[in-house]
Amino acid sequence: MSGGRRKEEPPQPQLANGALKVSVWSKVLRSDAAWDDKDEFLDVIYWFRQIIALVLGVIWGVLPLRGFLGIAGFCLINAGVLYLYFSNYLQIDEEEYGGTWELTKEGFMTSFALFMVIWIIFYTAIHYD
């Protein structure tokens, strides 16, 4: 017997119904991906919205945007980008997920809260006298 360690093999891809299970991240970037699990797709919409809120909060905080213009801009960009993503890029049937309104409002309030916190923190840190 040798004193060396046994080399562990990498884990095999998970099988789902006899087919290879595709990762969620590879589905997000492919326009022809099939979304079999409704909750998985709604999670993607939720986290995509959080990323948009984080990025826009930093941009709005660095730029001296204030008031209604900043909030309205966030709402339009956030809803618009996601609508374009799921209707034009993925070309999914919105009715399978409860309609366009359900997908548009999925995770909106939490992303709005995140946006406000990040916007206030960055604006205060950079522009506060």
UniProtKB/Swiss-Prot annotation:
Tissue and organ expression note: Expressed in neuronal cells.
One Gene Ontology biological process: multi-pass transmembrane protein insertion into ER membrane
Keyword Mitochondrion: yes
Cytoplasmic domain ranges by topology: 1-44, 85-103
Broad class of the protein's primary localization: endoplasmic reticulum
Subcellular location: Endoplasmic reticulum membrane; Mitochondrion inner membrane
Membrane protein topology class: Multi-pass membrane protein
Subunit structure: Component of the GET- and EMC-like (GEL) complex, composed of RAB5IF/OPTI and TMCO1. The GEL complex is part of the multi-pass translocon (MPT) complex, composed of three subcomplexes, the GEL complex (composed of RAB5IF/OPTI and TMCO1), the BOS complex (composed of NCLN/Nicalin, NOMO1 and TMEM147) and the PAT complex (composed of WDR83OS/Asterix and CCDC47). The MPT complex associates with the SEC61 complex. Interacts with NDUFS3, NDUFA4, NDUFV1, NDUFA9 and NDUFS8 of the mitochondrial membrane respiratory chain NADH dehydrogenase (Complex I).
Family per similarity comment: Belongs to the EMC6 family.
Protein name: GEL complex subunit OPTI
